[in-house]
Amino acid sequence: MCSSDLEVTLGAIDALAGVTNDPGALMVSARRLLEHQPVNAPLWNVCARAVTALDPRAELRTSARLLRDDATAAHLAAALPDDATVCTIGWSGHVVDALQRRGDVRALVVDSLGDGQDTLRHLSRAGNDCELVAPEGLATAVESADVTLVHAAAVGDDDVLACGGTLALASVAWCTGRPVWMVASEATRLPAALYDPMVDAVRGRPDPWASGFDVMPHGLVGAVFTPRGGPDGAVALAVSE
């Protein structure tokens, strides 16, 4: 999907800003937004902060600024080795941004529910060296890469929610001794009260394998990139917002 969680969240902030003078309307609007975005961590984060803030409008302005000024991609771009080959999966605007900033990094993009094709299209248009990898080629792609890049949709205390195939990608990298770097962008870190229900909704359905999401333990991650910097150890997941 090309419409990222970031774009949806920024649009929701604009909508919520129009009802900040009515706490009841703000609560109802936030609840309706979350019903339609059950795994959008930035949106859940923004809504939770807005409905509990003494000044919801100011809180929304702060959230919008932090999301727009997110420097995660810049930190990742600066850390990537020269002329490296990376393996990534699905769609991440921050990963794509980092690779476009570099230009010298080759990307092997494993598809996940068609999102890998969106990544390939954006990288190709920017002139990046990239190739789409079918799921059955995942292991060999990881072995051929210098770094495996994954992106957290939501970060919990012990694990992360990520696009389908991420657990397999990171597990292969871990087993073959390849570094796993993870992007945990602005507002993806959630408290247990928000993260656990999100994961339960994914795992509690009759066919969790068809949800499009994986739950990956922190232990598979060797380095983390957040808006505040990186590469940091996985311990950064415990404190990143």
Where are the language model's segments positioned?
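Long amphipathic alpha-helical segments
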Residues: 1-61
